[in-house]
A protein has these predicted regions:
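Alpha/beta-hydrolase fold catalytic core
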Residues: 1-17, 37-40, 77-78, 182-185
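Alpha/beta-hydrolase active-site loop signature
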Residues: 23, 47-51, 113
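Conserved serine/cysteine hydrolase catalytic core
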Residues: 167-197
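Helix-loop "lid/cap" segments that line or gate small-molecule binding pockets
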Residues: 126-132, 140-153, 161-163
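Flexible "cap/lid" loop of the alpha/beta hydrolase fold
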Residues: 93-98, 103-137
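Active-site loop/oxyanion-hole signature of alpha/beta-hydrolase fold enzymes
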Residues: 6, 30-37, 43-83, 87
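Serine-hydrolase catalytic-loop signature spanning alpha/beta hydrolases and amidase-signature enzymes
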Residues: 12, 21-31, 42
Length: 197
């Protein structure tokens, strides 16, 4: 799988690979990536089923880890520093536990290796109820999501996944809702086994 990525900093600096959280993308890390690029060669990846990367089943930590290793091999990286937020933090933990030789250091943001309660059901349902083919604007989508997602900031975050269709007929979600919903328990669960705790 050919993952999309954004890079910052000079290629001769130490590599730092950044993983976004669930429903996020490399776009979320543009400002931080530019700052970290003063010290590292920063590569912010779009993980499978997110951003500009391909859609694929399953959406599991094992599959995401293998995607990352393929990407690293294609870019001649034997090892790297890793920074992961939320779902991306769980992915980084899995790499640290299962393939420590590929890790130089680990930064995990806002997540622990444990099961979390489901928190996206109402958001997924509301996103699916929007008639994207007839949607006139992003503002209309924002109004539609208001009842299910009352927090303005959360709605704007979700709407970063809404893209105008190339043929001009409405919008589409850039995330793979089917894969994310089908693998929700996997995403919410611990990425590592009890032998790594």
């Amino acid at each position: 799988m050919e993952l999309f990525f954004r890079e910052y900093g000079e290629a001769d600096k130490p590599p730092l690979i950044v993983f976004h959280g669930l429903l996020g993308s490399s776009r979320n890390w543009q400002a931080a990536g530019a700052d970290l690029g003063k010290y590292f060669h920063v590569c912010c990846l779009d993980l499978r089923n997110h951003g500009k990367s391909p859609h694929a089943f399953p959406h599991s930590y094992e599959a995401m880890m293998e995607d990352v290793f393929v990407w690293m091999d294609e870019h001649d990286l034997d090892s790297s520093h890793f920074l992961g937020h939320s779902m991306g933090g769980k992915l980084a933990m899995k790499i640290a536990c299962e393939r420590p030789e590929r890790l130089r250091s680990l930064i995990v943001v806002d997540i622990a290796p444990k099961m979390y309660p489901s928190s996206h059901d109402s958001e997924y349902e509301a996103m699916r109820q929007i008639d994207l083919s007839a949607l006139p604007s992003r503002t209309a989508a924002d109004r539609f999501l208001l009842e299910a997602v009352p927090d303005w900031g959360n709605r704007q975050f979700l709407l970063t996944n809404l893209a105008k269709r190339e043929d001009g007929n409405g919008f589409s979600w850039i995330i793979n809702l089917d894969a994310l919903e089908e693998n929700q328990r996997e995403i919410e669960g611990s990425p590592i086994g009890t032998d790594h705790r």
